[in-house]
């Protein structure tokens, strides 16, 4: 059997079909193709001459009927800055309804009551769903370092006639159904310019490492019992492999030729929205309560602008602990830093603010527009064309050393002392006896501590 005749069989079950022409109109397939595939269905003894399902067909529907669903909601949603500092992305409200609640209701509407939500980041905020919607929660404790491959591996044992659903989608029309006959992966109908996915004429999903013309993937998938077992086997076998730490679970659907082992399900792109960024949420629902974050209010107040004048918000990956983002306001680019959780124990924000106050107007660092010493929020003007020093470039090093000497000779002073070696001891004390994640830590530490006597000798200068 193939996708075409299975689609026709499903239509025959769900619609009162009188003739082939009606079946062609409803399916979108040509009349010639419908006639050919209908003949095949009758040869397989699945449909009789009057478009009635046989007992064999009813058994097939029963075998593949949806049983449960898994909603993936463990990740940070890093691109959702600044919203993700307050709310996990599954709970973002669109049209006064959290995304995940809408998905749960759509699943329940087709009879799916066995729903498991895989949580991680801000997992406590999802707990109310257990009481309100009788869903189950599974925890991915590695959500901070690993991708959703591990989220699905957490629930590999329950996969079988299962919908797998990302939590960051808003679907105008439900993509779920009471009947399914084959495994599928959801993509948009519209051809887009930049995609790693393409549906070919054979109704196959082909993936590529390079972006090109193709279809937009939406992440929703249905797995029959047979295909779910194959996926679960791969998830469990590969879970311990480091190469999959950043993998999406969909790699388990690819064969050796980068072709998916499941069929495509195409949906009108105008009826489904993936919300990965603040801008996408604003585009879908300008009145969403989650657009009013503390960070955006701080920007509005500091720059004297309205929320709508803050545009082109873009996450910045740089920084070990901070959640920073780039934005534009009235043609000027800025960076806002939102300190990561727990960093107030590592950095004295009031001392940091004192340093920036002393540096103000000296053209030594970035231009600080706003700084809050209580919560560490900082807005700076974006430096276009700036780059880090190339430690392998002699000319770069000479310029940097000259700048450091100039800075040192300016003899700027603050009211506190920063002892780098004591800070190193303090940071390492937070490990509670555990060794460093970095293999060359001991070697680097030896080199740094080797400078201590030199620094101590000249620090008075």
Please place each PLM-identified region on the residue numbering.
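N-terminal glycine-rich phosphate-binding loop and ensuing alpha1 helix
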Residues: 5, 9-15, 20-22, 26-27, ...
């Amino acid at each position: 059997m193939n996708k075409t005749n299975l689609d026709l069989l499903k239509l025959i079950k769900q619609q009162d079909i009188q003739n082939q022409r009606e079946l062609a109109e409803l399916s979108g397939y040509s009349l010639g193709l419908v006639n050919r595939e209908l003949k095949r269905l009758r040869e397989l003894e699945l449909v009789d001459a009057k478009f009635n399902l046989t007992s064999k067909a009813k058994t097939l529907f029963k075998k593949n009927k949806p049983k449960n669903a898994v909603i993936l909601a463990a990740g940070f949603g890093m691109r959702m800055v600044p919203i993700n500092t307050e709310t996990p992305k599954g709970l973002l409200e669109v049209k006064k309804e959290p995304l995940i609640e809408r998905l749960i209701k759509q699943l329940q509407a087709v009879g799916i009551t066995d729903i498991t939500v895989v949580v991680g980041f801000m997992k406590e905020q999802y707990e109310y769903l257990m009481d309100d919607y009788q869903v189950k929660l599974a925890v991915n404790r590695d959500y901070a370092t690993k991708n959703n491959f591990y989220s699905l591996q957490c629930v590999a044992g329950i996969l079988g006639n299962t919908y797998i659903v990302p939590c960051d989608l808003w679907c105008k029309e439900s993509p779920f159904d009471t009947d399914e006959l084959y495994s599928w992966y959801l993509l948009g109908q519209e051809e887009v310019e930049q995609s790693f996915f393409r549906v070919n004429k054979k109704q196959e999903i082909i993936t590529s490492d390079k972006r090109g013309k193709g279809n937009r993937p939406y992440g929703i998938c249905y797995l029959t019992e047979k295909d779910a077992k194959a996926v679960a086997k791969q998830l469990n076998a590969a879970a311990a492999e480091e190469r999959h730490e950043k993998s999406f679970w969909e790699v388990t659907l690819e064969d050796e030729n980068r072709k998916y082992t499941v069929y495509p399900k195409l949906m009108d792109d105008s009826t489904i929205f993936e919300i990965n960024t603040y801008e996408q949420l604003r585009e879908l629902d300008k009145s969403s309560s989650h657009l009013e974050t503390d960070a955006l209010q701080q920007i509005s107040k500091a720059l004297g602008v309205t929320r709508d004048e803050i545009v082109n918000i873009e996450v910045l990956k740089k920084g070990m602990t901070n959640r920073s983002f780039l934005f534009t306001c009235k043609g000027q680019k800025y960076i806002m830093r939102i300190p990561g959780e727990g960093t107030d124990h590592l950095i004295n924000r009031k001392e940091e603010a004192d340093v920036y106050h002393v540096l103000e107007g000296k053209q030594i660092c970035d231009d600080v527009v706003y700084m809050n010493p209580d919560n560490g929020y900082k807005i700076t003007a974006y430096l276009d064309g700036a780059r880090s020093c190339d430690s392998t470039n002699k000319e770069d090093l000479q310029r940097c050393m000259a700048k450091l000497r100039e800075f040192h000779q300016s003899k700027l002073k603050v009211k506190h002392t920063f002892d780098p070696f004591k800070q190193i001891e303090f940071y390492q004390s937070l490990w509670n006896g555990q060794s460093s994640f970095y293999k060359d830590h001991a070697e680097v530490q030896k080199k740094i501590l080797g400078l201590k006597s030199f620094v101590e000798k000249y620090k008075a200068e």
